[in-house]
Amino acid sequence: MTIRLNKVTRDLNVGITTVVEFLQKKGYTIEASPNAKITEEQYAVLVKEFSTDKNLKIESEKFSQERQNKDRNKASISIEGFESKKEKEEVVKTVIPEEARPKLKQVGKIDLDNLNKKTAPKVVEPAAKVIEQTPKAEPVVEKVVERKETPQPEKETPKPVVVEEKKPEPAPQPAPAPVLEEKKEPKIEKTEEKTPQVKEMEKETPEAAPVQEKEEDDVFKIRPTEFKSKINVVGQIDLAALNQSTRPKKKSKEEKRKEREEKDKQRQEQRKLMKDAIIKEIRKGDDKISKNSVNDDAAKKKKRNRINKERVDINAAGTTNAGGASNNNQRNDNANRPNRNNNSKPNGNNNQGGGKFNKDRFKKPVVKAEVSDEDVAKQVKETLARLTNKTKNKAAKYRKEKRENVQNRLMEQEEMEQEDSKILKLTEFVTANELASMMDIPVTQVIATCMSIGIMVSINQRLDAETINLVAEEFGYKTEYVSAEVAQAITEEEDNEEDLQPRAPIVTVMGHVDHGKTSLLDYIRKANVIAGEAGGITQHIGAYNVKLEDGRHITFLDTPGHEAFTAMRARGAKVTDIAIIIVAADDNVMPQTKEAINHAMAAGVPIVFAINKVDKPHANPDKIKEELAAMNFLVEEWGGKYQSQDISAKKGTGVHDLLEKVLLEAEMLDLKANPDRKATGSIIESSLDKGRGYVATMLVANGTLKMGDIVLAGTSYGKVKAMFNERNQRIKEAGPSEPVLILGLNGAPAAGDTFHVIDTEQEARDIANKREQLQREQGLRTQKLLTLDEVGRRLALGDFHELNVIVKGDVDGSVEALSDSLIKLSTEQVQVNVIHKGVGQISESDVTLAAASDAIIVGFQVRPSSSAGKLAEQEGVDIRKYSVIYDAIEEVKAAMEGMLAPTLKEQITATIEVREVFNITKVGLVAGAMVKTGKVKRSDKARLIRDGIVVFTGAINALKRFKDDVKEVGTNFECGISLTNCNDIKVGDIIEAYEEVEVKQTL
């Protein structure tokens, strides 16, 4: 036998989840649904565990039942008169349509009026039946009543109709009410006359008149053996009539009003006592609280005793009545009060029952009044407790203040932490990538934000303070520069106007790769620089000081045009005075050209356009000018403000005119500098030379750099031991706008850093150490540890790989450009991590790091030392050496693609038409088919297609030709073919044979 879970929870007084969890612990798994079923064995386990809960429920139900009975007894007293009014009102509405009065008289309830009319013939019929059942007169009388009720009241009387109409409402009582109210006076008279008739009833056969008289005594003895449903109606109406003599007299309106006023006075007095108690307790202390609470309890007890007494009086009065309705409710304690107790049973057949529920509901406010007094007392105590706390000693007050202070401190600390989480502590050395890591956003968003404010940046490009502030503010962060004290340590000297002297302009040549930037400089310098560059493309910033025929000097910076050298172009534009943008006349305005123009515009540098290669047959300078005009750059020839010159860098056509225009722009700028002060400027490039140590190419912006000066650049410092110009000739000093190569630094400063000449080496060392410390802190801040979210993302991808790379190069700019390009190759599936980058040859420490982190080493124009090469062979570390940046990027990209798992691609090999189907025993269906296209192989997979819909997909089970197994069948040949586990082949179906081919993934 199974039991529903809903019933089990109600029986055991526990929740469904509790039952399910307990059964799961015991090894039973059931659904957590009220309709789920459990076995007897599981039920026994539950009963054993939760028997205490079941007992508690039974006890609580008993307790609540007793309390309800008490509440009803109380309610019957206080609202009796109030309800009688409503009964009267309802009687008026229901008396007219009901024909219950004559029918009730026929039953024998009102025998005096209709004794001789209708009851006599009806009594005769059941008399014979009664004799068959019981010889006594008493049961016969009652059963006569039953027989009369069964045919007449159920069919004719409207009592069952009343039940249907008034069940939704709680008051279906008005039907019998008219009998109670209207026939009080005649019934009181009849009780006096009926006393002699009771004696006659014992001797004579039963009649309808004595039936009502004998009910007073007989009901208590016989009713337990009778059916409740049929006698309920009779008993209620009789009691209402017969109990009038013993029932307490109904109170008049004045008496009820007086009672209500007395109760109100009592409540007001109690409230006054409460208020007085509060005042006394405040004045006298805790001692009198207990006394007052005792008095309050006493007052409440008095009230309850008074109600109980009234209840007992009514019960006593009720016991004198021989109410037939005691049989209606054998289980109730107050059986002598039928109209009230019948209603407490929801399954009673009495139609009057609903009305008494209304009495209970009207009584509820009275009960709540008592509860509210308790609440008042409770609130009084709480109020006093709060008031008396203030009068305690100073120690308690001190402890409270201490607790509050601790809480305030904790709250302030939390607020500070929240604010700190939105404050970025950084130095001015921060790159775009590091800034993105600190803000925990993609680096593409940082670059996009910079582009929106007109600044072109790359991933590894260092940002200045102003840009960092703008970007951080865009994403809701505040910045705090921890390097402020270091910056203040270097004081800038103010130049006097009279000390300033004209200086040579610094001109940057920018443009797309292969558009002729270096060729132009070659012609100007009369030297072939390109021959020295690997692959014929510029990979370093070249800084050259050119002396013109008229004795004037121009410093040229040649920037790379390849897209990887974004940072170099940005640096070139940053330190320059004028920008020459070269565009090939036989090409278009390319992406790097646009980027170079944007860099120059962001730096606020005047632009001169040089349209190169005009000597070529397909050259079209006007097309270039048209494209520039579309970008809002109108040249002077077309009525704009930008100067342009058509040139041929190889032949030298127009180069002289171009230089004149550049010098004209320089004169308009009025460039001046003070040569008689300590030098400042920018680091253009830095590298590690095996014979000479760390070498830095600098461009002096102001002042004069001399041999022996103490130079501080970024985290590197040192004494200038030797100086060379761009032709590797030794010089003693370098003035403003002169490029110079110096030896003597203790490290390779980052390209783009500014340099200063410091008074003492000690001061330079201190500042450099502080900067190095800040840089290490910055590195720790930007280190992004592996989070659970990232682990989850990688697991979700399934095929995730990391490629760790160590980049070493000859100069800092190239290292930065290469690492930048490699990081850009990262995808969701393969992530490139540049774990270390540096300038100089590949050392043993690089190999050790690569072995520990499972990385490859990419050397750009550098070679490993002999010891590093041997160690790499032992450790199995892969060292790749490149001279052109294109090759490095392509090979790393190929390595990343090799790490990806190949994808499977379907390739259709043949289509076969089914001509005939054979059903062979122990084999199944075999299709006789013709190969329409392609060549079907035994190893292929197949799809069965019917009317263009795929019916089956699976493997080829057998492939035969003339009873011989074959490996393949070509086009226009017949064959027999069967598919594995396919028994639904029909004539006209198409079988499509295909094979799965592994395809290498691309990035």
Swiss-Prot record:
Residues 61-74, 139-169, 180-206, 219-229, 252-290 have a biased composition (Basic and acidic residues). Signal peptide: none annotated. The keyword Protein biosynthesis applies. Residues 511-518 are annotated as: G1. CDD domains: IF2_eIF5B (cd01887), IF2_mtIF2_II (cd03702), mtIF2_IVc (cd03692). Its main location: cytoplasm. GO terms for molecular function: GTP binding; GTPase activity; translation initiation factor activity. Residues 502-672 form the tr-type G domain. Residues 648-650 are annotated as: G5. Keywords: Cytoplasm, GTP-binding, Initiation factor, Nucleotide-binding, Protein biosynthesis. One of the essential components for the initiation of protein synthesis. Protects formylmethionyl-tRNA from spontaneous hydrolysis and promotes its binding to the 30S ribosomal subunits. Also involved in the hydrolysis of GTP during the formation of the 70S ribosomal complex. Belongs to the TRAFAC class translation factor GTPase superfamily. Classic translation factor GTPase family. IF-2 subfamily. This is Translation initiation factor IF-2. The gene is infB.
